[in-house]
Amino acid sequence: MNNPLPDVALTEVSSALVSLDWVGMQGVEVPVRLAEAGVRYPVHAHVDLQVDLADPSVKGIHMSRLYRLLDRYAEHQILSPDTLGALLEAMVESHLDCHSSRARLTLSFNLLCRRPALITEGLSGWKSYPVKLDATWHAGRLCLDVSADITYSSTCPCSAALSRQLLEGAFTARFGRQSFVDPMQVATWLRENASFATPHSQRSVATVQVRVAEQATELGLMTLIDAVEQALGTPVQTAVKRADEQAFARLNGQNLMYVEDAARKVQQALEGRYAASSVSVRHFESLHPHDAAAQTSNYLS
């Protein structure tokens, strides 16, 4: 028997004549290849992909067409603005019989790359950065936003000042009545008592989103991540030895920051590099059972 299989999406009309903004699939898993410095392996990505269904008389789209386009893309292409634009355009063209004119795609993955230790030569470890791409295609134009989560350490300026005051008091109590203090005696005292009080610090996360220029040929994921880490000054480390941990302690002391400071530092580092950028930071407070948060954006509302 070679009876044709029914396709009700083509042969039936929707009972409710309502146009739909987006129709498609969510959470499709594919391997994706990247052209990023220090990234040598494909990433495991989750993809949402959709087209519009503006014609209310069309019952449904053809999801298998979208899946096959994505599957071929993952098999043969390297992720870039150009290849993403071509994929989205092909998604629209595959649904001309549904009168679709727009397509969008969201792609999420963890970007793994090696990061060197601060001091120890030859020592490095893997660090993961959650990344998301939001791309839309309409009227022959690609709109692409890239976001990434960057983890760093934040030390509270107020807590640092309070700790210094306590240390000052302890030092004065010990040496205040002496007209002369032997430097070696002070050094010994500091070695034993400098942690008389310590400021609170915590792991923190900056989520940044930027608009990729239309003429861009690369995603520039590592360029974005490096810029944020450099602005903050205290990115979390991977493999460390004592010398690296000491260097990290110095960086934390040199980069005291409130959540407001962190948001401003990152936004300032991004301005001028991208057409639009937004920053959202969270400090997972060790002093409080709640988080501190700040946001800023120059995206047009």
Curated annotation (Swiss-Prot):
Stored InterPro entries: GTP_cyclohydrolase_FolE2, GTP_cyclohydrolase_FolE2/MptA
Alphabetical keyword list: Hydrolase
GO molecular function annotation: GTP cyclohydrolase I activity
Annotated site (May be catalytically important): 156
Pathway assigned in UniProt: Cofactor biosynthesis; 7,8-dihydroneopterin triphosphate biosynthesis; 7,8-dihydroneopterin triphosphate from GTP: step 1/1
Entry-linked Pfam families: GCHY-1 (PF02649)
Protein name: GTP cyclohydrolase FolE2
Stated family: Belongs to the GTP cyclohydrolase IV family.
Functional summary from the UniProt entry: Converts GTP to 7,8-dihydroneopterin triphosphate.
Claim: Metal-binding is one of the keywords in the record: no
Its EC number(s): 3.5.4.16
Gene Ontology process terms (BP): tetrahydrofolate biosynthetic process
Reactions this protein catalyses: GTP + H2O = 7,8-dihydroneopterin 3'-triphosphate + formate + H(+)
Organism whose genome encodes this protein: Pseudomonas savastanoi pv. phaseolicola (strain 1448A / Race 6)
The keyword Hydrolase is assigned to this record: yes
Domain of life according to the entry: Bacteria
